[in-house]
Amino acid sequence: MKGFYRLLFILTLLFQFNGNAQITPSPIKNSKVIVIYGSPDCHYCIDLKKTLVDQNKNFVFYDIDTNKVALNEMLTKLSRAKISTTNLQIPVVDKYGVMYVNSANFKDFVEKIVE
């Protein structure tokens, strides 16, 4: 029985450290990288990513549905920028330290990101 508990303890430690490594957003070394917070099923997120690829822009996408660390990072950045999270629409973009949220006019939002 002691062996079972030792094995359970070791497996718990292994999965705990592996799980944390997978969900932590890596720091962006290059300040010329656009960070997108969104959902892989969001049509606005899909359209924005396609536009950035077409425009040859560097970006990183974080799925805030599954990555709670990225979600908290996004909320912290919005709070620091004094942007309300009430009725927030995705995608949310950090473009070189300036935060942008999806507005009523998606075309204008995308133009701000790609310019």
Each model region followed by its residue ranges:
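Boundary at the C-terminal end of the N-terminal hydrophobic targeting segment
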Residues: 19-21
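Solvent-exposed, polar/charged alpha-helical surfaces in well-ordered, non-transmembrane soluble domains
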Residues: 46, 50-53, 72, 76, ...
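Local sequence-structure signature of Cys/Sec-based thiol-disulfide redox active-site neighborhoods
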Residues: 24-60
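Thiol-based oxidoreductase modules, predominantly thioredoxin-like and allied folds used
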Residues: 58-75
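Structural micro-motif
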Residues: 81-94
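Bacterial N-terminal signal peptides
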Residues: 7-16
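Non-catalytic, surface beta->alpha helical segment in thiol-disulfide oxidoreductase systems
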Residues: 94-115
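Bacterial N-terminal signal peptides that target proteins for export
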Residues: 1-7
